[in-house]
Regions:
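Non-catalytic C-terminal accessory region of glycerolipid acyltransferases
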Residues: 2-3, 7, 103-235
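Alpha-helical membrane-targeting segments
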Residues: 2-23, 74-90, 169-173
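A secondary-structure boundary/capping signal
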Residues: 30, 45, 67-68, 122-124, ...
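Short secondary-structure boundary/capping segments
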Residues: 18, 32-33, 55-57, 83-84, ...
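Helix-to-loop junction immediately C-terminal to a conserved catalytic motif
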Residues: 14-46
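Short gly/ser/thr-rich secondary-structure transition/capping motifs
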Residues: 21-28, 101-103, 160-163
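Catalytic core of membrane glycerolipid acyltransferases/transacylases, capturing the structured
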Residues: 34-99
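A generic local structural motif
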Residues: 14, 26-31, 51-52, 79, ...
Length: 235
């Protein structure tokens, strides 16, 4: 076992998960839907920064989540703590600027899948600014067509109340629920990597299943665009 895997196991099982269960009403459902071996994509909604602890903490196996590059940047003490936490929890840095840089980042995710491991993705690309479920980015579909594996839809609820936007302290005692749905198979789309309609259809089907599990209202708008709208209204 590599030193990084040892660090992940120690951080998760001896520190993170015990703290989550101590501080919050942390519930996990549907763990039997996670394959005990082999590659799969864990596709989750994204409500709060601490999803990066609650979701991996609920998964028995090691899982590498794709995280935005800003979480790995900065030289301040706070930035270093966040960066260390993200790496300890198995996060992989992803460039969301588009083009070659984004494709290269997704390539790192494909390597994880080819190695027979679990890869975690937030298809919305960023946290929901309003509690609703937003239009998914098609990067997840590209990964699926390049490296066909099952998709496990994941729904988290309550994490947005643990550390609301702008809050400085955690709200202890809040209920947080993580639910894993049944595996989804997209092998019927094999060979259609360049078909943008297929990419959108796969992504929308995944988002629909996440929404069914989470009970969130779905809006066909990217979360990043919705965030700008919310910011403009509050300005």
């Amino acid at each position: 076992m590599s030193s990084l895997r040892v660090l992940y196991w120690l951080a998760k099982n001896l520190i993170v998960v015990p703290l989550l269960r101590l501080l919050f009403r942390y519930e996990v459902h549907g763990v039997h839907n996670i394959p005990k071996k082999g590659a799969a994509i864990m596709a989750s909604n994204h409500m709060a920064l601490l999803d990066s602890a609650f979701v991996p903490g609920a998964i028995p196996r090691h899982v590498a989540f794709l995280g935005k590059e800003q979480l790995f940047a900065g030289k301040s003490l706070q930035a270093r703590v966040v960066r260390g936490f993200m790496k300890a929890m198995g996060q992989l840095e992803i460039d969301r600027s588009g083009g070659i840089a984004s494709a290269s980042s997704l390539g790192g995710g494909a390597d994880v899948l080819r190695a027979g491991k679990l890869l975690g993705i937030y298809p919305e690309g960023t946290r929901s600014p309003d509690g609703r479920l937003h239009r998914g980015r098609t990067g997840i579909a590209r990964l699926l067509l390049d490296t066909p594996v099952p998709v496990i839809p994941v729904a988290i609820s309550g994490s947005e109340e643990v550390l609301p936007r702008g809050a400085k302290f955690l709200k202890v005692g809040k209920r947080v629920i993580v639910t894993f749905g049944e595996p989804m198979d997209f092998s019927r789309y094999a060979g259609l990597t360049e078909d943008r309609f297929v990419l959108r259809a796969i992504t929308d089907e995944i988002m629909h299943e996440i929404g069914r599990l989470s009970g969130q209202e779905y809006v066909d708008v990217y979360a990043s665009n919705a965030r700008r709208t919310v910011a403009a209204k509050s300005a």
